[in-house]
Amino acid sequence: RQMVSAIRKHDADHLITVGVIPWAQVFPGAKPLFYSPEVARHLDFVSVHFYPKSGEVKKAVDALAVYDIGKPLVVEEVFPLSCSLEELDQFIQQTDDRVDGWISHYFGRTIQEHRQGAEPAGESVAKFLEYWQAKGGRQKQ
């Protein structure tokens, strides 16, 4: 409440959220701070970083459900850091109905620069950026 009041004192227009890392992936059933109605009522939307682990897509899907508290839900950082691109796609497909927005992690280089070996990760980042570019541009109905 104190943080939101301080922001609203200077800016009544911009949306407010608190980004979190997905502790529910590590501790099944863990609830984020904004799960509390006293906290949630002050937020305009919920945001979380999500990095599914290889072989644990269902666990990641189940963990994301904890963050669905009746507010718009944005996965504000996602990347196949610990899973394959195919597993990340499964995660996105299985949760897209409850996620209102997706923002990927970006390394500051073009696809071509990554193809030519830009660090970090080079070719794997190029493949992800191509995937993400192909996924983009969809509007929710």
Give, region by region, the residue ranges found by the protein language model.
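Extracellular glycoside hydrolase catalytic/binding regions
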Residues: R1-T110, H114-L129
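Carbohydrate-binding surfaces of carbohydrate-active enzymes
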Residues: Y131-Q141
